[in-house]
């Protein structure tokens, strides 16, 4: 089970270049200066040697390459996100303690998501209090740096009490609980025969022409609060989907009655 949280974001303008966030060194981490949270630099990438970061390295490399173009292009016009924002926490720049990866959920930038929040070995050895302090500093800095965000969304496993407590301390409110399933189709999956469908139903692929039909269905079934938080447009739905994505359309009413979308990698908040 996973718990999904949201938090209202800053409604006032955020300074164009906020200073690096610093907090006193968390209990359990001896020596060094105050905790600092700053954008990840290219020279810091080889320092992320902990196993906790292994699966993030390709994403972090992409972020370093595309963060500049992402900021420039988004300032010119609403468009899908090219790369996430990556912040790193440290007392000594040569010894990263944790990383947070966040990204816009929509073209407008009104909703952001925490994609990854990872703690290194040194942070974990500091105990729960040390880990909570570092992760809280990372999330707080990510929220402060976002421009125009009206809401933030994060998810956490129900069993991770430290993560849940940290999110609650930062003002995140429980939104809903989900059960995640992993489906592994057989090697020779049966193919759907469109002729077997009722005559009034048409199997339609998601594309720019049909996207509005599926968007209307999703808007109708989403809880009102979640619909408001996500602030998703038709373009956002297309940006976040890839093929195969299909829907069943009632030809008489010209409405989608069912649909399944394949999400692009990283579109779901997985902290």
Where are these regions (language model features)?
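Conserved active-site alpha-helix within GNAT-family acetyltransferase domains
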Residues: 158-176
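Conserved catalytic-core motifs of GNAT/GCN5-like acyltransferases
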Residues: 173-186
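Conserved donor-binding loop and adjoining core beta-sheet/short helix segment
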Residues: 63-136, 250-271
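Short hydrophobic/aromatic beta-strand or adjacent loop that forms the aromatic wall/cage
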Residues: 84, 176-178, 243
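Conserved acetyl-CoA-binding loop-helix of GNAT-fold acetyltransferases
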Residues: 125-144, 165, 169
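Conserved GNAT acetyl-CoA-binding A-motif
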Residues: 146-157
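Short amphipathic alpha-helix that is part of the acyltransferase structural core
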Residues: 2-70, 194-229
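Surface-exposed interaction/gating patches
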Residues: 184-253, 257-261, 267
């Amino acid at each position: 089970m996973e718990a999904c949280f949201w938090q209202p974001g800053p409604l006032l303008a955020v300074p164009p270049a906020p200073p690096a966030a610093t907090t006193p060194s968390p209990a359990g981490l001896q020596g060094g200066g105050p905790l600092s949270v700053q954008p990840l630099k290219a020279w810091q990438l080889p320092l992320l040697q902990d196993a906790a970061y292994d699966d993030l390295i390709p994403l972090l490399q992409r972020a370093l390459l595309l963060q500049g173009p992402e900021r420039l292009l988004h300032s010119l016009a609403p468009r899908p996100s090219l790369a996430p924002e990556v912040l790193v926490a440290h007392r000594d720049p040569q010894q990263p303690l944790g990383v947070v990866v966040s990204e816009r959920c929509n073209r407008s930038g009104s909703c952001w998501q925490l994609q990854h929040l990872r703690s290194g070995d040194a942070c974990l050895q500091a105990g729960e209090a040390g880990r909570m302090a570092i992760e809280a500093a990372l999330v707080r800095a990510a929220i402060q740096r976002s421009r125009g965000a009206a809401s933030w969304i994060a998810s956490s496993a129900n069993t991770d009490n430290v993560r849940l407590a940290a999110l609650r301390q930062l003002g995140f409110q429980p939104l809903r609980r989900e059960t995640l399933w992993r489906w592994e189709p057989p090697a020779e999956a049966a193919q759907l025969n469109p002729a077997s469908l009722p005559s009034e139903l048409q199997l339609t692929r998601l594309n720019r022409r049909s996207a509005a039909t599926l968007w209307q269905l999703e808007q109708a079934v989403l809880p009102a609060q979640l619909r408001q938080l996500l602030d998703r447009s038709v373009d956002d739905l297309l940006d976040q989907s890839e093929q195969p994505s299909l829907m069943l359309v009632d030809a008489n009413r010209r409405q989608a009655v069912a649909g399944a979308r394949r999400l692009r990698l990283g579109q779901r908040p997985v902290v």
